Amino acid sequence: MLDMETPLKEPESSLGSCNEPSSRTSGQDATTQELAKLGEEILSQLYQPLEECDNSCYCKRCCYHCQLCFLKKGLGICYDRKGRRRRTPKKAKAHSSSASDKSISTRTRNSQPAKKQKKTLEATVETDPGLGR
């Protein structure tokens, strides 16, 4: 039988693992240091100016090649052509302003039947055999 006065022994393995550094903690320290270095590298790349890249491929690998490729190919953002926007000539602007006085519905309603009427008139003239012959 067990005596109530005898103290229970604590497992020695649990005490040893708490007091002594194990190989797990040293491995975790190494991975955290690597992650810290990687984070610093990413931040340094973030603040670098974008370099010109002449890669014209749009595959997934090339889209993530560098930050410029990601912006241009992956997201479709291109900052190169700000001043090359086509402008309408002044004559076209004057013509469009007179057309804008009419409502859109009247313009579309009037323009389509006029074309159909012209076609039907031409068709009837061609099919008429003429008078008295």
Curated annotation (Swiss-Prot):
Region feature (Core): 70-80
Region of interest called Cysteine-rich, as start-end residue ranges on this chain: 53-69
A molecular function GO annotation: RNA-binding transcription regulator activity
Compartment(s) where it occurs, according to its Swiss-Prot or TrEMBL record: Host nucleus, Host nucleolus
Keyword rRNA-binding: no
Domain of life where this protein originates: Viruses
Gene Ontology biological process terms in this record: positive regulation of viral transcription
Main location: host cell
Motif residue range(s): Nuclear localization signal, and RNA-binding (TAR): 81-93
Polar residues: bias regions: 14-34
Chain positions with Phosphoserine modification: S97
Keywords on record: Activator, AIDS, Host nucleus, Host-virus interaction, Phosphoprotein, RNA-binding, Transcription, Transcription regulation
Biased composition (Basic and acidic residues): 1-12
Biased composition range(s): Low complexity: 95-105
PTM annotation: The phosphorylation by CDK9 does not seem to be important for transactivation function.
Ranges for region Disordered: 1-34, 83-133
Chain intervals with Basic residues compositional bias: 83-94
Entry-linked InterPro entries: IV_Tat, Tat_dom_sf
Function comment: Transcriptional activator that increases RNA Pol II processivity, thereby increasing the level of full-length viral transcripts. Recognizes a hairpin structure at the 5'-LTR of the nascent viral mRNAs referred to as the transactivation responsive RNA element (TAR) and recruits the cyclin T1-CDK9 complex (P-TEFb complex) that will in turn hyperphosphorylate the RNA polymerase II to allow efficient elongation. The CDK9 component of P-TEFb and other Tat-activated kinases hyperphosphorylate the C-terminus of RNA Pol II that becomes stabilized and much more processive. Extracellular circulating Tat can be endocytosed by surrounding uninfected cells via the binding to several surface receptors. Endosomal low pH allows Tat to cross the endosome membrane to enter the cytosol and eventually further translocate into the nucleus, thereby inducing severe cell dysfunctions ranging from cell activation to cell death. Through.
Domain description: The Arg-rich RNA-binding region binds the TAR RNA. This region also mediates the nuclear localization.
UniProt record similarity statement: Belongs to the lentiviruses Tat family.
Subunit structure: Interacts with host CCNT1. Associates with the P-TEFb complex composed at least of Tat, P-TEFb (CDK9 and CCNT1), TAR RNA, RNA Pol II. Interacts with CCNT2; the resulting complex is unable to bind to TAR RNA.
Protein name per Swiss-Prot or TrEMBL: Protein Tat
Species of provenance: Human immunodeficiency virus type 2 subtype A (isolate CAM2) (HIV-2)
Top-level taxonomy: Viruses, Riboviria, Pararnavirae, Artverviricota, Revtraviricetes
